[in-house]
């Protein structure tokens, strides 16, 4: 009986200890340490959300307009460009949201599977973007240098796009193969491995864990080299054509000047003998030659403007691709040489946000700058504005002055009785 109060005290102390342990566990679960600083998370998440909205909206607009106009889908160039826009939509829907999830995860959560999926998406985006840009570069070269004998026919373009998607899917699977995700004997051993995610565990420095970086780096540099060589050849081809045509045009001008002088001499000689008919003939020939010279000058100016436009677009395409994807490619090379660390992983996320910016630039560079696409977009906007104006009539018979709507269209002509009588009496007066 004397041990009963001691037992009660021990039971109370043990219950107090267990309650405190439970409270401590709840506190640690509620306040888990974040993998990144709050300002870092907010800024990068804001940029990524902006890229999702702008990239998804612009690429879907381009795809809808391409599908609505059948004449835009018939060409090989537009099909290859549509393939790039489909890829950008996939990146905006799948890859960028997963990067946001990686940013907002805590350190103590089990992020192995999510990190593996994220690395697979990054590998897919990097490889497929580089290959699609490479295909568009070859198509531009084929159009500019060999317009008569094109290498990329419709069948070859379909085969090229099929191979692009197969290789992109293989690049998506490489991070899973690195961690033995598909092997039956591994069990849950892959779950302890982290692929370039900030965590409490150490990074794996084995080369077999970073084969996906070894695939991304050479494809990027190969695409850059091909772009530089191809666009320089395109510009050289345009210069040669303009120069040769311009020189032949000058020769034609000199010949035409000689013919003008000969024609004037002939007209002066013949005018002394045969009078006014030869003078009229000489004037007609001189006028036709002047018109031909004006047309030649106009064509030369149009070629010069086209050359400047192609040169500017080539610089923009190359510079945007280099600006967006060079930092992350160089950082991947640094990770392969020095090994991963928290600082390098954070920098890699920043550079990945820059790389995702191509989803916004691709529609601006490859779709909205084309004249056919601009015509289709303007026509759709005009029809939309006209339908809105006609569907919502203004009260009190208000008149809407719109430059896109012909004011003379659907205009009813009304005459008063006096005007009708005057118009009916006018022919009778004339006949009388």
From Swiss-Prot:
Glycan attachment sites: 16, 192
Effect of disrupting the coding gene: No visible phenotype, however mice display increased susceptibility to heart failure under conditions of hemodynamic stress.
Expression by tissue: Abundant levels detected in the brain and heart and no detectable expression in other peripheral tissues.
Record topology, Extracellular segments: 1-45, 107-115, 178-208, 336-348
Parts of the chain on the Cytoplasmic side: 67-85, 137-156, 230-314, 370-432
Keywords: Cell membrane, Cilium biogenesis/degradation, G-protein coupled receptor, Glycoprotein, Membrane, Receptor, Transducer, Transmembrane, Transmembrane helix
Entries under InterPro entries matching the protein: GPCR_Rhodpsn (IPR000276), GPCR_Rhodpsn_7TM (IPR017452)
Subcellular location per the Swiss-Prot or TrEMBL entry: Cell membrane
GO biological process: cell projection organization
Annotated family: Belongs to the G-protein coupled receptor 1 family.
UniProt-recorded name of the protein: G-protein coupled receptor 22
């Amino acid at each position: 009986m004397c041990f009963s109060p001691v037992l009660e005290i021990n039971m109370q102390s043990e219950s107090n200890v267990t309650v405190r342990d439970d409270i401590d566990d709840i506190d640690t679960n509620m306040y888990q340490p974040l993998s990144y600083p709050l300002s870092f998370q907010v800024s990068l998440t804001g940029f990524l959300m902006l890229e999702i909205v702008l990239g998804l909206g612009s690429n879907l607009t381009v795809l809808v307009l391409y599908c609505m106009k059948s004449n835009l889908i018939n060409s090989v160039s537009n099909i290859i460009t549509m393939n790039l826009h489909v890829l950008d939509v996939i990146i905006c829907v799948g890859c960028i949201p997963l990067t946001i999830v990686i940013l907002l995860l805590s350190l103590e959560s089990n992020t192995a599977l999510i990190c593996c999926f994220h690395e697979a998406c990054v590998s897919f985006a990097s490889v497929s973007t580089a290959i699609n840009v490479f295909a568009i570069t070859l198509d531009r070269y084929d159009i500019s240098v060999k317009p008569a004998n094109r290498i990329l026919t419709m069948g070859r373009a379909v085969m090229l796009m099929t191979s692009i998607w197969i290789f992109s899917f293989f690049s998506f699977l490489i991070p899973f193969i690195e961690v033995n995700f598909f092997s039956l004997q591994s069990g849950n051993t892959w779950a302890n491995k982290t692929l370039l995610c900030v965590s409490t565990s150490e990074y794996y420095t084995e080369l077999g864990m970073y084969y996906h970086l070894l695939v991304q780096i050479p494809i990027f540099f190969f695409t850059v080299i091909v772009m530089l060589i191809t666009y320089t050849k395109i510009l050289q081809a345009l210069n040669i054509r303009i120069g040769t045509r311009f020189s032949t045009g000058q020769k034609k001008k000199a010949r035409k000047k000689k013919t003008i002088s000969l024609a004037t001499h002939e007209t002066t000689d013949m005018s002394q003998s045969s009078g006014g008919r030869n003078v009229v003939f000489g004037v007609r020939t001189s006028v036709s030659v002047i018109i031909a010279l004006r047309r030649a000058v106009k064509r030369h100016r149009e070629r010069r403007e086209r050359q400047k436009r192609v040169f500017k677009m080539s610089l923009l395409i190359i510079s945007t691709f280099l600006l967006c994807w060079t930092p992350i490619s160089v950082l991947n090379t640094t990770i392969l040489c020095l090994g991963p660390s928290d600082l390098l992983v954070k920098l890699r996320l920043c550079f990945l946000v820059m790389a995702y910016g191509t989803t916004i630039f691709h529609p601006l560079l490859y779709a909205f700058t084309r004249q056919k696409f601009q015509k289709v977009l303007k026509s759709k906007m005009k029809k939309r504005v006209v339908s809105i104006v006609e569907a919502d009539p203004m009260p009190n018979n208000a008149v809407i002055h719109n430059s896109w709507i012909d004011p003379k269209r659907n205009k009813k002509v009304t005459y008063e009785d006096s005007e009708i009588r005057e118009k009916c009496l006018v022919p009778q007066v004339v006949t009388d």
